[in-house]
């Protein structure tokens, strides 16, 4: 059955989900032309801006039949541009993208020819990917290749940020005036950075020009199409598009329709300027749109149906944009088409009052009706949120496709204030990507990569030696067979952790400098607060707040592993360290009795058992203390968050067996969720265990829970879901999300994938088509503990 409330959006949705993801070579060609023309003659920020402007002036424009919101990243829906200045793919990369079984991108023969003859020769030695790898120390490279951590900027650009309200108050002509005024104020006598500021500001002004051109070109194209159109209804739509593009993005929006189109033009601009990770995000969309909605309804030019239709059109636009193609380790850490555009709904308003409004409910209806993996939608639940809103969100969630996710507004505000933000800015913040918090429109909060915490224990148990890569990756902290206490083991673990965090942050500092020098983003700098005022590009610390995150992975696995060692080796003395190490080396073959002890007769995290939960707290605090507060190149600080995307699969693949009974190469635990099968006391025990982590010290945590459909059916099931969310959030939990499915359905989908093309599940901080997941990830989701109330 076609989904969509209106015939228009039913058609657009079907076209979107059936469009083949493909490589769009056009951006690479136009950027190459611009670099050949301008490189060496202007400062790099201006080079970036002129290249972006050249791209905007010459790129293909797409207005798809029936749509009301216009703009694509590629040449057509599901076209993925490439970014050779950041990552110049090899011909082998293109072959892999074209032929791999999942997350594949069609690459035409023409695109391959152009890439081989024009793109690779120019960009091979210019790409930042090579600059980064070549600048890394042998220790960093060894740790990276061993899977101790990942690096987001290896194929993507920093730029994880969220849209604030600037674009709804000012058009790009207004922003250009602000930039020109700031240029006149530069003090070259007393400000040693004035020359760099001049280049940054001039680049921002050029980026504003480019955005004005983008709107003008779309207005002209829509009018041209209207002149040729014989269908009166379609002609009317095209003229409306033209009138809308006459206003935005050059000027501030005046209507609900214009506000949506304004955001979308900015989204397309920011995500084609650089392939930022994660994609640019609307943030508090209901808060931004509601004033336009109320005014238009009052003026009689908008009703609820039309407002929903326009948002359904926007949902299709998000779904038309696959994440930039990835290869190698970067694909393993985020194996999905989704680019993590995340919409926050609900929460509180700037005055601290309930933020739920009519647009909030419209957004819930849109996500329910459209059922698309992009955008990823969440609800912020505060103590002031109406129960009606929470239950409507739960009603959608229990349908089984993983949206919306649930976030604790009070926790988000406290997390941001803990990190030094003002309460006014914190109230306007929220979550993006998977679960990460930030002050929307005011903060550059860049994810730098995942940290494999269980593998740090693996190094500790092998005196710094990695049994998988057969290399000395860590430092020598002693033979664990000689440790006389659990405390001695944990001290050794903390030393390995300190060493690995040092390596990671040392590399990050180099990468930040490379990106600031070679990959400024003048367009994004125009819309992030304080960049214009400071005269500094986003990449140089122009934003009001500059945060860097290192995401911890596998807290459930390492908690149960250290618990197993403390309980069985040191406290109960059921076996010694030497026997355990031999069992791990043998993948427990021949050591089934030990496997049974650690798997079934040892305290586990996720059961409200203080024995295990206190160890979780120790591990978390060690990680927090190592990372949080370290300075960044841009004048901000490092923080931690706890999420995996799909990295828990990769991290497990490059590990041997773990002391908790996890077998060699099997996934480690995801988010802050307990190890699969370890949580046996129900969902209330799970949230009690998870709440013992101090979420307020983080920038986000991710908790998955799984139910069978029968458990959450009816009014009682709905109340149980809502009450679980409220209970967890009353304990300061950050986030919870639900998978609701029949295990047998997923097993059948593995056997007959052609019959389950529309099956969607929750993976980590996002939902995805079951058929787009690797078999290992499918098995991991199927194996998650099925909870009952």
From Swiss-Prot:
The gene is pflD. Residues 670-789 form the Glycine radical domain. InterPro entries: Gly_radical, Glycl_HYPD, GRE, PFL_dom. Residues 7-663 form the PFL domain. Keywords: Lyase, Organic radical. Glycine radical enzyme that catalyzes the dehydration of the non-proteinogenic amino acid trans-4-hydroxy-L-proline (Hyp) to produce delta(1)-pyrroline-5-carboxylate (P5C). Is involved in the anaerobic degradation of 4-hydroxyproline. This is Trans-4-hydroxy-L-proline dehydratase. GO terms for molecular function: carbon-oxygen lyase activity. The modification Glycine radical is found at residue 765. The active site is at residues 434, 436. It comes from the Bacteria. PANTHER family: DEHYDRATASE YBIW-RELATED, FORMATE ACETYLTRANSFERASE 3-RELATED.
